[in-house]
Amino acid sequence: MTDSCAKLLADNQLTVAFIESATAGYLSHCFSMSLYSGDVLMGGLVCYDVSIKKKVLNVSDQLIDEFTPESAEVTRELVHQSKLLFDADVYVACTGLLKPGGSETEEKPVGTFFYCIGYKSEIYDFRVFCEGSPEQKLNSINSLICKSIIDVVNNH
């Protein structure tokens, strides 16, 4: 799925940048393995620890305290902040709960991921649940994000 997504971006002369929390660079890694990586991958930033979200990406304490680091609201803000760091066409931010120890609740169990795709003047928000081992969850979220990028680019 990554290669299909990267090919679509390359065919449309679009670049992508990633801001990754729970995926910790996995999305950037997957794109770097594509034959089209040199044409599409601008780079990425891992903000696994909340201090990076605050100090590097300027996400406010208030937003994090109100919604938690793993939330739709913080993920959307990561897309906004990524536009100040990267000159890309597509911006992807992902937060979530890969394993226990984050902000999981009954309503937001481990396996919940939030991702946002910024394209042109729009931001598209997604909330998904992935099951399995951490590795299986990473593979699932990568596939889901690639499919969403394809849908966003094709339908915009």
Please describe what each predicted stretch is.
Residues 1-156:
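Short alpha-helical segments enriched in small residues
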